[in-house]
Amino acid sequence: MKKLFLFLLISLFFSFSCKKDIIIVEAYYTNWFGGVKEVRGKDFMMVIDKETSKNLQIKHFLINDKKFNVEVEEKGNTIEIKSRISEGIDKEIELKNPIEKNSFGIEYYNTKTNKTKIFKLKKLQYKPRSNQQEKFS
């Protein structure tokens, strides 16, 4: 009986200590091309679970260690975090190159712990735009 109680106590401790601030539903980027010749960029999107993220204030996207402003929108049980980056305009990021591994994430403030944290993804998925055919020259 003591062993069972000890096991349950340890399991409970680990479940609280390993609780994540963010549960990602989806994270991806798409290419976009503007109406003006040679204007292009990327849209970045991260969808996170609303319930586990209720104490968070999303501050920035981190892309190749540079900070970019975000739009945050609640939709049902999720929170959408978006950013549109224009090549050559926004901090002169080189968007023709792929996003480096482990270099995409978000910076957020946790109101419960009063700490700013960074959450990084190992890989960011590319998703072609459905309403726009992409042409590469």
What are these regions (language model features)?
Residues 1-23:
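Bacterial Sec-dependent N-terminal signal peptides
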Residues 18-137:
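Non-catalytic macromolecular-recognition regions in eukaryotic signaling proteins
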